[in-house]
Design a protein with these regions (language model features):
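Short structural boundary motif marking the start of a folded domain
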Residues: 2-7
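Short, hydrophobic beta-strand segments that form beta-sheet elements in well-ordered domains
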Residues: 8, 78, 92, 177-180
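Short polar catalytic/cofactor-binding loops
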Residues: 10-15, 44-46
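Short glycine/threonine/proline-enriched tight-turn/helix- or strand-capping micro-motif at secondary-structure
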Residues: 17-28
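Glycine-rich beta-strand-centered segment in the early N-terminal region that forms part
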Residues: 28-46, 54-98
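NAD(P)H dinucleotide-binding glycine-rich loop of Rossmann-like/cofactor-binding domains
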Residues: 70-77, 87-156
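Mid-domain Rossmann-like dinucleotide-binding core that forms the NAD(H)/NADP(H) cofactor-binding site
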Residues: 126-204, 208
Length: 209
């Protein structure tokens, strides 16, 4: 590939994001400067935080401007480097732009050199071994200190962190009940994620349940 494809913001999002809010742009592949390295992005994480960056309103991050490249956590591989700490072939997790190739430097946000385990797909590092999985694991074990035989109730159970929390709790021998916002999500967490039961907070009586 000789060009760098980028997903850019075509218009601000006011409700649920639609395809027309985004556009595809192409440009040259950048060259790393001194202390930088070029990353070939392989996987991106669809983070809830991105929604807050594409509405034109400032929050803890500056909003992405119209025409700006969408950003989010990614996993990629170094293909060219002028940084002694990152060499060609290294796998890297970082907050990058949604593009084929990104320039990174040592002080990039969330930058981490990965040491992939044999047999573990690299995509897991933006999923179950990424932020969502870590949040679920720490919340259950370090904060909740769950024990086998307990009942664990998970809110937002169909989301990234909630679905991971439910599956981890099941593996630990707990009964798991998930709270979701639709019958479709209720069926999903029971049939696909292995929850014992689901509550649709929009239609079910949570107190009675």
């Amino acid at each position: 590939m000789t060009t760098n494809r980028q997903v850019v913001l075509a218009s601000y999002v006011t409700d649920a994001a639609q395809p027309e809010n985004f556009a595809l742009s192409e440009g040259p592949i950048p060259e790393p400067g001194k202390g930088e390295f070029l990353l070939r992005n392989m996987y991106f994480s669809m983070e809830p935080a991105i929604r807050g960056w594409i509405d034109g309103k400032a929050n803890y991050f500056e909003p992405i401007p119209i025409g700006g490249v969408i950003r989010g956590p990614s996993v990629g591989q170094v293909i060219k480097s002028r940084n002694n700490d990152f060499v060609e072939g290294d796998f890297v997790f970082a907050l990058n732009q949604w593009e084929d190739y990104s320039i990174c430097h040592s002080d990039a946000i969330l930058l981490e050199k990965l040491q992939p385990e044999a047999g573990v797909p690299i995509s897991y590092y933006v999923g179950s071994l990424g932020g969502a999985g870590a949040t679920a694991y720490i919340g259950l074990h370090e904060v909740g200190q769950i024990q086998a035989g307990q009942t664990v109730v998970v809110s937002a159970a169909a989301g990234a962190t909630g679905s991971m929390a439910g599956q981890i709790a099941k593996l630990c021998g707990c009964k798991v009940i998930g709270i979701v916002g639709s019958d479709k999500k209720a069926q999903l967490i029971v049939d696909e994620f292995g929850f014992d039961a689901a509550i649709n907070y929009k239609t079910d009586d949570i107190t009675a349940a």
